Amino acid sequence: MMKRERCLAADLRKILYLGATVGLTLALMFGRAVAEQSTEDLAAAAQNPVAAMYSLPFQNNIYGGVGPQHNSTANVLNIQPVIPITVGDWNIISRTIAPIIYLPSLSTGPSEIVEQSLFNKSHFGLGDINQTFYFSPAKASELIWGIGPSFNLPTATATPLGSAKFSMGPAAVALTMPKPWVIGTLVRQLWSVIGPSDRPNVSQLLLQPFVNYNMAEGWYLVSSPIITANWEASSNRWALPIGGGFGKIFRIGEQPMNASLQAFDYVKSPTDGPRWAVRAQLQFLFPR
């Protein structure tokens, strides 16, 4: 028990160091007056995955009904810094997802995992970090799009929290913004290219359609379910949630913020996967 507590404490320190590093980096980058923008402009930029705006979202996902008995709850906090760079007529949008994962104790893990004994206890730590670069035209048009490479880095601090594989593949996003709507979709396909031979290969599709309806005073309705397919699974490949929620653009002092809350029900789910999910997001906005 003491050894386990020391391991969890060590994992927590690593995560705190990561958060401190991200925070310090962003503080140095954004240590200047925030550009004034209207609430309408901020909402449009916050809802556009390839907008040329610095931002720091903290997205917390609660997954209920996981495990063989569908009575356990997992949690994933995604730290997702967005850094845009303009090069000539193009914007290069760097989007990072660093997941901090709590996985409850389960009698068995996913059927593709060989080391079933690892799921007899709970795990908390850093998962695999995803890094995506979108190349998007800097000139505005009715159809906004971006395309580029995506990489999954084997950074997990515990075996059940990651794939142990370096994976890569294409990513793309397309959207249109006929006021007051923002409608689009994001897609990514990853394949493992390097990693231990005793761990399952990775071939995973991620599809995220999103619809936003903007209203007065920064309020909006949103639906952005994350649909995934594990092509390596022999059955129950799809995770298909449906749902949505609401959000608001606001300011704390001079700092623009974006907060949202969504709830989802899973109409299809992998073996031992979730039955429902709640997603809460708080996003710091740094207009240029």
Where does each model-flagged region fall?
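N-terminal secretory signal peptides that target proteins for export/translocation
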Residues: 1-15
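Short, low-complexity disordered leader/linker segments with a strong preference
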Residues: 7-8, 26, 30, 34-35
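Enrichment for repetitive, rod-forming helical segments
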Residues: 10, 20-21, 102, 255
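Short alpha-helical segments used as structural interaction elements across diverse proteins
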Residues: 10-11, 29, 245, 276
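Residues at the start of alpha-helices and the adjacent loop-to-helix junctions
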Residues: 11-13, 27, 201
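Bacterial N-terminal signal peptides
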Residues: 17-29
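Transmembrane beta-barrel domains of Gram-negative outer membranes and organellar outer membranes
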Residues: 35-288
